[in-house]
UniProtKB/Swiss-Prot annotation:
SUPFAM superfamilies: C-terminal domain of alpha and beta subunits of F1 ATP synthase, N-terminal domain of alpha and beta subunits of F1 ATP synthase, P-loop containing nucleoside triphosphate hydrolases. The ATPase of P.modestum is of special interest because it uses sodium ions instead of protons as the physiological coupling ion. Its main location: membrane. The record marks 362 as: Required for activity. This is ATP synthase subunit alpha, sodium ion specific. The keyword Translocase applies. It comes from Propionigenium modestum. Its EC number is 7.2.2.1. Pfam families: ATP-synt_ab, ATP-synt_ab_C, ATP-synt_ab_N.
Length: 500
């Protein structure tokens, strides 16, 4: 057999050309210090801020501090499984969470894992946890109303789709109740809801889930829970997980309502994490970037332009104050980021006025553009009369000899306050609210005893619903024109004659 060198060299050449070896390069380092859910890692010189890290036993971490000779990382999961000397690998990926229709009706943790015992989740898309908010050109002014079903809010502090409206007040003043009412009122509107519980008791979260289920609201709601027993990094991640899930629906042109309950505990979790990472503390021991922590979260709520689907995320962040001090660090930060605030007053709450919304100092900076005309027509007068009533109330405490006009104004004010009272989980549709306000500002309740006002309102609305087309006309025309005004006045007068 004759050996042909050129043939052999040809075969070798072909083999060399076709040879491909893929190199899987992974940066690795080792844990030099671990404790309190924080790990310091030596050797991860190419790690990026926010990059996911792989610890042994399937534990994940996130690189946050990139220092000269080590990386400070938070451990997402059980920190007891990490020990000094463990090998850590950089994944090259940033934190992301699964999103999709399958999440509706489920309770998940900050990592998007189900914690409700209803089986596994099959999500449709991975969404980055920290995504840049949409720019100015991609947005559109707020112009569609988001009805909460609460008369004080829809009338005097209206919210539009794409708005950020802060709910602020002391503990036990009904902040969560207002947010839950808003979620329950989205039934049959097509709005998807996300409730993010940060640092709350597990029993409280269980009650909220049960309440949403009883009201038939859980089917269009995602609950993201990072309870008080979870580590600070998981509490820090929870709101970003919630908004990432919401962005999936917004990108599809759908509307989302997200509640962050509450951002005070979120800031405390971030402070704990930052101090453990040895970042320098600032005012109230919060780190210097605590404003950016909330601004980058709340800026992701938006009303998108028609060119990119016209979807929206409406955010209702909640802040807890100490003894009504709204000038503390975190409250002032969040007030300056949001488009208005709903202030819940502990004095009103304790006097039996629920929901305890103080309409005088609550404000909505952009929601007015989203109100229907019929509501604008009646609510402006309600707000004015309420302001005058509160002013007169102060004077009335000093003297009893008041003239008839002042007494009449005080009596009207008492009835407006009575009309604004509302039971929890009993939302009013917008046309019913318009009728209630119309009735009180036109003096039809002035001679009705205060303890009979709410019965009058209830029976009047039932009468209009059963025997007239007035409510349907308000929905259709969205304004009270002369003919509808006359019809409504006649209906109220006829009802008043037979009311006893």
């Amino acid at each position: 057999m004759k050996i042909r060198p050129e043939e052999i060299s040809g075969i070798i050449k072909t083999e060399i050309e076709n040879y491909k070896k893929s190199l899987d390069v992974k940066t690795s380092g080792s844990v030099v210090q671990v404790g309190d859910g924080i790990a310091r890692i030596y050797g991860l010189s190419n790690a990026k801020a926010g990059e996911l890290l792989e610890f042994p036993n399937g534990i994940t971490g996130m690189a946050l501090n990139l220092e000269e000779n080590n990386v400070g990382a938070v451990i997402l999961g059980d920190p007891t499984g990490v020990k000094e000397g463990d090998e850590v690998r950089a994944t090259g990926q940033i934190a992301a969470v699964g999103a999709g229709e399958a999440l509706l009706g489920r309770v998940v943790n900050s990592l998007g894992e189900p914690i409700d015992g209803k089986g596994e989740l099959k999500t449709e898309k991975m969404m980055p946890l920290d995504r840049k908010a949409y720019g100015i050109i991609s947005r559109k002014p707020v112009h569609e109303p988001l009805q909460t079903g609460i008369k004080s809010i829809d009338g005097m502090v209206p919210i539009g789709r794409g708005q950020r409206e802060l709910i602020i007040g002391d503990r036990q003043t009904g902040k969560t109740a207002v947010a839950l009412d808003a979620i329950i009122n989205q039934k049959d509107t097509g709005v998807k809801c996300i409730y993010v519980a940060i640092g709350q008791k597990r029993s409280t979260v269980a009650q909220i889930v049960k309440r949403l289920e009883d009201a038939g609201a859980l089917e269009y709601t995602i609950v993201v829970a990072a309870t008080a027993s979870e580590s600070a990094p998981l509490q820090y991640m929870a709101p970003y997980t919630g908004v990432s899930m919401g962005e999936y629906f917004m990108d599809k042109g759908e509307h989302v309502l997200i509640v962050y309950d509450d951002l005070s505990k979120h800031a405390v979790a971030y402070r704990e994490m930052s101090l453990l990472l040895k970042r320098p503390p600032g005012r109230e021991a919060f780190p210097g970037d605590v404003f950016y922590l909330h601004s980058r979260l709340l800026e992701r709520a938006a009303k998108l332009s028609d060119e990119i689907g016209a979807g929206s995320i409406t955010a209702l962040p909640i802040i807890e104050t100490q003894a009504g001090d709204v000038s503390a660090y975190i409250p002032t930060n969040v007030i300056s980021i949001t488009d208005g605030q709903i202030f819940l007053d502990s004095q009103l709450f304790n006097s039996g006025f629920r929901p305890a919304i103080n309409a005088g100092i609550s404000v909505s900076r952009v929601g007015g553009a989203a109100q229907i005309k019929a509501m604008k027509q009646v609510a402006a007068q309600v707000k004015l009369e309420l302001a005058q009533y509160n002013e007169l109330l102060t004077f009335a405490q000093f003297g009893s000899d008041l003239d008839k006009a002042t007494l009449a104004q005080l009596e009207r004010g008492h009835r407006i306050m009575e009309i604004l009272k509302q039971e929890q989980y009993k939302p009013f549709v917008v046309e019913e609210q318009v009728v209630s306000f119309f009735t009180v500002i036109n003096g039809y309740l002035d001679d009705i005893a205060i303890d009979q006002v709410r019965r009058f309102e209830k029976e009047l609305l039932e009468e209009l619903k059963d025997n007239t087309t007035i409510l349907a006309e308000i929905v259709e025309k969205k304004a009270i024109k002369e003919d509808l005004d006359a019809k409504l006045r006649k209906a109220i007068e006829d009802f008043k004659k037979k009311f006893s």
